[in-house]
Swiss-Prot record:
Membrane topology listed for this record: Single-pass membrane protein
Keyword check for Transport: yes
Keyword Cell inner membrane: yes
Organism: Bordetella petrii (strain ATCC BAA-461 / DSM 12804 / CCUG 43448)
Localization of this protein: Cell inner membrane
Pfam families cross-referenced by the UniProt entry: ATP-synt_B
Protein name: ATP synthase subunit b
Sequence intervals crossing the membrane: 7-27
Gene encoding the protein: atpF
Broad class of the protein's primary localization: membrane
Length: 156
C-alpha cells in the first residue's frame, strides 16, 4: 500500500503541476510565441510591401528617365534648329553685307573711272590745244608736224 500511496501522491502532484502549468505557465508562453509569430509575419509583410514599393519606385524612375531622355532629345533638336536658324540668318546678313560692299566698290570704281576719263579728256583737250598752238606758230611742214605729233603721243 505504501507503494500505491506514493504513486497516488506522485500522480496527484503531477496533475497539480500539469494543471498549474496549463493555467499559469503555458498561456504566457503561447502568448509570447504568438506575438513572436505575429512579429515575424509583420516583418515578412513589411518586406513584401518594401519589395512592391521598390518595384513601383523603379517603374517611376524608369518613366522619369524615359521622360527626361525624350525631353532632352527634344531640347537638343530645338537647339539644333535654333543654331541652324542663327547660322542661316548670319549667312543672309553676310550675303547682304557682301552685296552692299560689292555694290559700293563697283560704284566707287565707276566714279573713279569717270574721274579718270574726265581728267584724260581734259589732258587730251589741253594737249590738242597746245599742239594746235605749236602747229599754228610754225610754218606748215610735214616733218615738223610729225615731230610735234610724236611729242604729243609721248606726253599722252
Amino acid at each position: 500500500m505504501n507503494l500505491n500511496a506514493t504513486i497516488f501522491f506522485q500522480m496527484l502532484v503531477f496533475f497539480v503541476l500539469g494543471w498549474f502549468t496549463m493555467k499559469f505557465v503555458w498561456p504566457p508562453l503561447t502568448k509570447a510565441m504568438d506575438e513572436r509569430r505575429q512579429k515575424i509575419a509583420d516583418g515578412l509583410a513589411a518586406a513584401e510591401k518594401g519589395k512592391a514599393d521598390l518595384a513601383q519606385a523603379q517603374a517611376r524612375v524608369s518613366l522619369i528617365e524615359a521622360s527626361a531622355k525624350s525631353e532632352n532629345h527634344a531640347r537638343i533638336i530645338e537647339a539644333e534648329k535654333q543654331a541652324a536658324s542663327l547660322i542661316e540668318q548670319a549667312r543672309r546678313e553676310a550675303e547682304a553685307e557682301r552685296a552692299r560692299i560689292v555694290a559700293q566698290a563697283a560704284q566707287d570704281a565707276a566714279q573713279e573711272v569717270q574721274r579718270a576719263r574726265d581728267a584724260l579728256r581734259d589732258d587730251v583737250a589741253a594737249l590738242a590745244v597746245k599742239g594746235a598752238e605749236q602747229i599754228l606758230k610754225r610754218e606748215v611742214d610735214a616733218r615738223a608736224h610729225a615731230e610735234l605729233l610724236n611729242q604729243l603721243k609721248a606726253q599722252l
